[in-house]
Amino acid sequence: MRRILGVVAVCGILVLSALPAGAQKVEKAPPGGPYKKVSELVKLPDFLPGIGTLYVDPKTLPEGPFLAYDHQEKLVSTIFMIPLKDLDAQKKWDDLAAPGGKVDHVSIYYNAGHPGVPEPHYHIVLWHVPKAQEQLVAK
């Protein structure tokens, strides 16, 4: 139960921290600044079905934000990858920022681990497109 409440609290913080002013800088891939293409940092494909092409500032690993782009290089979501061990330890996140701007809806799902974030974690996906447009990254 505490884990669920932790995930819900993190989601609330993330939605409230969406920064519309920064949205213009990350609207199209590749984003500027310290962001690097995830596929150039770890062994992952350039485009992940269901997620898109990911960019991250390596200093923010493992949590992110990861910026996800569709095939037309348009930002579709901001993803945070929150390790279970941090949720269980009731870690506080008060400095997470969602640079992608307005959030349409949120998805949360478990992941057992993958290159880049090998430990079990939750993906918290802040979608910047309507639910019907999630298909832009389906394949």
What are these regions (language model features)?
Residues 1-8:
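Bacterial N-terminal signal peptides that target proteins for export
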Residues 4, 17, 24-26:
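N-terminal short leaders/motifs
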Residues 8-17:
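Bacterial N-terminal signal peptides
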Residues 22-139:
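Metal-centered catalytic cores of metalloenzymes
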